Amino acid sequence: DLVRSRGLGDVYKRQLLSVLFGAFGKGAAASTDGSQGGSTDKVVHAIDSEEGAMMLGYARSVVIVPGYGMAVAQAQHTVRELGEQLEKMGVDVKYAIHPVAGRMPGHMNVLLAEANVPYTQLHDMDDINAEFERVDVALVIGANDVVNPAARHDKTSPIYGMPILEVDKAHHTIVIKRSMRSGFA
């Protein structure tokens, strides 16, 4: 297994993982309401491409959650390549699609179809949420509000009450975004 994950890092460290993992900021505490700072029960920490590759390489199951940030980065083809590489290593790969991720409903479906991600790997929120508790790694790429747990219980949040993809229930969650600031695209 170490050879498999090392191979993934060697093959993609410069091309793929540098695109995906290169823009992490400093570690910070995350509060239970999804905002930065305050009372915490989970700690956010930066990881480098090697640590990310090892987490993904040792996983049995990975759910990729694309968002508007993936669209802006035009990374859908790179994301598909990552999924294919993980599948070659025996990892079960799925894509979780929030109905309003991106700039319009269906935006992520269109981008992933353009990148030739098999439609059978795309799962809508209602179907995939029950699976997150059994997922080894949830990989969130450029999604903010559609995974923010503040929508569940922070009545002061502008997204309070919005259904979210429950990535926080996965064993590990990797969030790829440009900064640690909160953001609603």
Where are each of the predicted segments found?
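Terminal amphipathic helices with adjacent charged low-complexity linkers/tails
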Residues: 10-28
